[in-house]
Amino acid sequence: MARCGAGRAAALGLVLRLLLGLRTGPEAAPAPTSAPAHTLVQVSGPRAGSCPTDTFKCLTSGYCVPLSWRCDGDRDCSDGSDEEECRIEPCAQNRQCQPQPALPCSCDNISGCSAGSDKNLNCSRSPCQEGELRCILDDVCIPHTWRCDGHPDCPDSSDELSCDTDTETDKIFQEENATTSMSSMIVEKETSFRNVTVASAGHPSRNPNAYGVIAAAGVLSAILVSATILILLRLRGQGYLPPTGLLVAVKESLLLSERKTSLI
């Protein structure tokens, strides 16, 4: 009995399956499942030169990116063409090239700002000090001696321009001035020394020591003359000298004292 019940149940299940298959038909058969294929399709977009005016066309891919993304420091195109040649042509959305952020509008006599906005700046330059010169393209003052010294001191190197014809002339002129100045100083010193010497000799009152020398010379001469006369008189009294010899000796002593005085 148990076996008959199991056989009937199996037969009933087979019949039910056949009936379900007939009702659904081949259309209800489940299709084999498969993962959808995600392929990157490169959209060619508009043809070359047909991007909107407010966009930038990537060179390789042809994609159009907003013009504000151009030269913003971020590579938006796959080939990085939106970040190329940014120092040459950093243009804004209205296609008017603006100065770089690192180089703001300045008073350099060059129209680098849009709509001439640099003309509205306060571009009055303060004058350079005496002995200085101003660089041509930069508001920088440097000493005049730095001109044509073989080393560019101006940011634009304008202090070393046109030095082929001026350098030798400037050097010769400076050397001649230096030589003339040295000669003048030497002549002035020699002249001053001579004037001081002559003035000291011609005007004893300007040299206090001259009085002492003259007084000492006069006293010494008087002592010598007096001593000579006393000696000669003593010798004469002892009979050693004739009268004529006394006169000659006195005369010679006087002449000797005068010579000594003139030498002093």
Swiss-Prot record:
Residues 1-28 form the signal peptide. Glycans are attached at residues 122, 195. GO terms for cellular component: plasma membrane. It is a single-pass type I membrane protein. Keywords: Cell membrane, Disulfide bond, Glycoprotein, Growth factor, Membrane, Metal-binding, Repeat, Signal, Transmembrane, Transmembrane helix. Receptor for transcobalamin saturated with cobalamin (TCbl). Plays an important role in cobalamin uptake. Plasma membrane protein that is expressed on follicular dendritic cells (FDC) and mediates interaction with germinal center B cells. Functions as a costimulator to promote B cell responses to antigenic stimuli; promotes B cell differentiation and proliferation. Germinal center-B (GC-B) cells differentiate into memory B-cells and plasma cells (PC) through interaction with T-cells and follicular dendritic cells (FDC). CD320 augments the proliferation of PC precursors generated by IL-10. This is CD320 antigen.
